[in-house]
Amino acid sequence: IVKEKMLQASSSDTVRSRSRTGKHSRQLKSSWTDAWESESAPEPLPMPLQPMVAEPALAKVNQLAEGGHDGAVNLATYWVGQGVGLMTESLSAGTVVQEFKQDFINAYERFEGFLKD
């Protein structure tokens, strides 16, 4: 579920929040982060206490979200960078390496062409 949310997200779908670790980290915006950022929310605990509270709950959220629970899907979040919107599809590591290799070959051939001119 989180991977699907990442693939659909843009940089505006992220938030810096202390809700997971007690320290600021960029995460996918979700009902979880919204609740922690609301004025009525308690202050997150300092690290390492906040993860001791948050991670068991988020593990259960992820488990329920994978099972299709709508409320859990809305709560599910994970760490991301601002470039999350650049990811548009899920590729295997092998595919990424092969594409990188082909890009290198293409660049090398273009460079070689410049040297011949």
What is each residue range found by the language model?
Residues 1-117:
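Conserved active-site-proximal phosphate/metal-binding subdomains
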